[in-house]
């Protein structure tokens, strides 16, 4: 999606106005909001923020995006922002960026900084390799430097020339030196000199990621009565195991939870009280998997519980995870009772074919196909 379209959708959806906000005020506001969310300020100030803190944070995020869009477009001349399967992080006053594609496994670090370009590229490689798995330490929507020193989220996914996992400054710097010697490239990009390197994750990176989250997937799937192969299939389809996945809706994390819809339903189930999960909460893999499987449980046992056949219901749950249970039922009939009756009169295969043909949105129709195909690879 084009970055400007992305912005427009966010702004239309939120109704956020942009007048009267200067760049430094927006950045200061973002910083304050994050500190509040992370509990870094006094309780007197924090008590003035709504319980979830999500509405103010979302407004600030949207304002920041709107303020920075023209600056980024002017500097890079393209539309590269974070997406569900691609991590994008800008540093060096938006002159350097890292792009990690979790689907292909390609990693690209590039800079258009005209001064000390090789050093900036070297620094960008090191910070990318050492980006921590703790989401509170990484702001995808600013050019702030990454605070390293914790376990990197790429640990084990990238190996150096000794085939060793990279998790120390020494090893990251040495590998950056190697990349600058062997993979450095330069070209002319939108009238600017661009310096970049491209390297790759290990060949079986998605399997490695799946294994990393295996304990939590198994634990939460058993807890909520969800087949583990379905949980894995949804994670892969939604984010390709990108823990920093973020979409324009916005949805966050491995299972792409929308805070104000699935997030609220899952929060209520998990905490027995109303609430909305924050962005940083959903960027935590364990929390995200817990919420995602909880929402699958809600679809399975509440919204679509009247579907009698387990396999038929699973097809409906998969489609419902993407488009909502209401749209699933409307694919059969505008009346809920009649919709359930029609579903229960069909075989699982007939239901699958009907959904593939009659779901309102092409995305949902394709989603059902993708998840069921991926699911087969995770079946024992």
Describe each model-derived feature in a short phrase.
Residues 2, 7-236, 301, 305-308, ...:
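Cell-wall glycan-active module
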Residues 239-248, 264, 323-335:
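Secretory-pathway/luminal and periplasmic proteins that interact with or process carbohydrate-rich
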Residues 248-275, 290-298, 345-346, 371:
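Substrate-binding/active-site groove segments that recognize
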Residues 212-215, 225-229, 249-252, 287, ...:
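Short, well-structured alpha-helical interface segments that form or flank functional binding sites
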Residues 194-201, 270-279:
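Short glycine/proline-rich turn/loop motifs
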Residues 277-287:
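A short, structured beta-strand-centered segment in the mid-to-C-terminal lobe
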Residues 288-338:
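Catalytic and binding regions of secreted/periplasmic enzymes and modules that target cell-wall glycans
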Residues 225-246, 257-258, 292, 317-322, ...:
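Short, functionally critical alpha-helical segments immediately adjacent to catalytic or ligand/cofactor-binding
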